[in-house]
Regions:
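N-terminal maturation segment of proteins
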Residues: 1-298
Length: 298
């Protein structure tokens, strides 16, 4: 009975998140409506990045932001009341739902114009607060770089000079991206218990905006397979560090691996909250941190 109660809370959370996406473009980073999905239409574009990768249709209609604020606030109170008498085995899941319901509530209020401090925002959205630093430390680091970096000019100029030397020519880009993607893919298989079925298809093309790094298209997913294409922008200034960032961090063993594992968790548990990753949520913070850590380990 208790699991069905939590599933009810979780499904209401998902319903509200999807409705909020009407007012919060780009918020839905990943969504698995069921245990598998396959694109059945050729109505997609390799020219424009549209998130999510497939149309959620009527699921994003039915609630205003004011509705979402009121309902999420009520559900937060009910979740906290339920937590007081819940068994120990449910505590972690309840904490997850409370944190994510709070981020939904807070983000909806932001969209309605409510202001807050930076620390209040990160605490409510991501369950994180930036540590306090003595900023003189950064000046000390800058001074050490200034003394030791080769080249002429200030630190930023010398960094740019160095980056020019690791810029990848456009005619070499596809081979470099494929080789690096394959290397990260092998490391992920060896160290993260993956089937190896989700290596993305890599393409390069001139996208409309030179600041647009890539365009992603999802074609299908199931329990242990994500069929995925990534189009990298030939107009972007590609350097070695950017290739590492946008392959390992963004794909395997980073975000793509996380989405595969999360989809498996959704199917294994049947918990509705595992079906979705919102940009403005603690799950998003974990997505970014785990991708950084995993790609650095490779």
């Amino acid at each position: 009975m208790s699991e069905s109660v939590l599933n009810m809370f979780a499904q209401q959370y998902i319903d509200m998140i999807l409705c909020k996406s009407r007012y919060d473009v780009g918020d839905i980073q990943w969504f698995t409506e069921g245990p598998f999905w396959r694109r059945t239409s050729m109505k997609f574009s390799r020219e424009y990045r549209i998130l999510p990768d497939y149309e959620i249709g009527d699921l994003k209609h039915g609630l205003t932001l004011e509705n979402i604020v009121d309902r999420s606030e009520t559900l937060l109170r009910e979740l906290k009341d339920y937590e007081e008498t819940s068994p120990l085995c449910e505590k972690q899941r309840i904490e997850y739902l409370i944190c994510h319901m709070r981020s939904l509530w807070f983000r909806s209020k932001m969209l309605l114009g409510e202001k807050s401090s930076f620390d209040q925002m990160t605490s409510a959205l991501y369950n994180l607060v930036a540590p306090v630093y003595d900023y003189s430390l950064f000046q000390q680091i800058k001074t050490e770089l200034d003394e030791n970096l080769p080249g002429q000019g200030n630190v930023l100029n010398r960094i740019e000079q160095f980056r020019e030397g690791i810029t990848i020519p456009a005619d070499k880009l596809l081979n470099v991206l494929r080789d690096v993607t394959e290397a990260f893919h092998r490391h992920a298989i060896q160290n993260m218990h993956l089937t190896g079925n989700s290596m993305p298809r890599i393409r390069v093309r001139a996208l409309p905006d030179p600041n647009m790094v890539f365009l992603s298209i999802l074609f299908a997913y199931d329990y242990d397979h994500i069929q995925y294409e990534r189009n990298f922008n030939l107009k972007y200034n590609w350097t070695v560090d950017k290739v590492m960032e946008y392959t390992g961090h963004e794909m395997e063993p980073g975000h793509l691996t996380y989405y595969e594992k999360r989809t498996q968790c959704f199917i294994d548990t049947g918990w509705p909250e595992m079906a979705e990753v919102s940009l403005y949520s603690p799950s998003s913070a974990f997505t970014e941190g785990s991708a950084r850590y995993a790609s650095d380990l490779c």
